[in-house]
């Protein structure tokens, strides 16, 4: 992935640009990852920074990928969003300042949060590709899952 943000932005699809740079929202149930159930991580489409893990993904029946927590809270920024006559908490990536989606206090995890994220803001890296794509440090997340299932 190139280090020049302008070059990376030129590589985005129209929808990816609309979502990440113009705070857009893709259609529910008509996006790449809402129903994906593979093990892996979801990275920022612009910066490539890891944002979410499939281990924290759940079906919120909303039509967008939903997660109970970020894989690295330091890569997430939350901002007040009063657009469209609503009061919500917007979620942005810290490194690329990309709009990702919103976080709501109605999730199933211990913190009760639901990170509702646009697929267009993400790129999925399957567990088996983590090493070769430079995300080897995240393999251990899935090794813990495997050892937890065996005990």
Curated annotation (Swiss-Prot):
EC numbers, comma separated: 1.8.4.12
Signal peptide: none
GO cellular component: cytoplasm
Alphabetic keyword roster: Oxidoreductase
Domain MsrB: from-to ranges: 5-127
List of catalytic residues: 116
Entry annotated with the keyword Oxidoreductase: yes
UniProt keyword Amino-acid biosynthesis, yes or no: no
GO MF annotation: an example: peptide-methionine (R)-S-oxide reductase activity
Catalytic reaction equation(s): L-methionyl-[protein] + [thioredoxin]-disulfide + H2O = L-methionyl-(R)-S-oxide-[protein] + [thioredoxin]-dithiol
EC class: oxidoreductase
Pfam name, any one: SelR
InterPro entries registered for this protein in UniProt: Met_Sox_Rdtase_MsrB (IPR028427), Met_Sox_Rdtase_MsrB_dom (IPR002579), Mss4-like_sf (IPR011057)
GO biological process: protein repair; response to oxidative stress
PANTHER family: METHIONINE SULFOXIDE REDUCTASE (PTHR10173), PEPTIDE METHIONINE SULFOXIDE REDUCTASE MSRA_MSRB (PTHR10173:SF59)
UniProt record similarity statement: Belongs to the MsrB Met sulfoxide reductase family.
Protein name per its UniProtKB record: Peptide methionine sulfoxide reductase MsrB
Organism, as annotated: Bacillus licheniformis (strain ATCC 14580 / DSM 13 / JCM 2505 / CCUG 7422 / NBRC 12200 / NCIMB 9375 / NCTC 10341 / NRRL NRS-1264 / Gibson 46)
Lineage, uppermost ranks: Bacteria, Bacillati, Bacillota, Bacilli, Bacillales
């Amino acid at each position: 992935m190139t280090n020049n943000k302008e070059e990376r932005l030129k590589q985005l699809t129209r929808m990816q640009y609309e979502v990440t740079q113009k705070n857009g929202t893709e259609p529910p149930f008509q996006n790449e990852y809402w129903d994906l159930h593979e093990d892996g991580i979801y990275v920022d489409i612009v910066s490539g920074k890891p944002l979410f893990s499939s281990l924290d993904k759940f079906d919120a029946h909303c039509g967008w990928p939903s997660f109970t927590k970020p894989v690295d809270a330091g890569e997430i920024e939350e901002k007040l969003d009063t657009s469209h006559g609503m009061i919500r908490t917007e979620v942005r990536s810290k490194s690329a300042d990309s709009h990702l989606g919103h976080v709501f206090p109605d999730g199933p995890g211990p913190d009760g949060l639901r990170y509702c994220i646009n697929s267009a803001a993400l790129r999925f890296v399957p567990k088996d590709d983590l090493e070769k794509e430079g995300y080897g440090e995240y393999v251990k997340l899935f090794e813990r899952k495997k050892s937890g299932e065996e005990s």
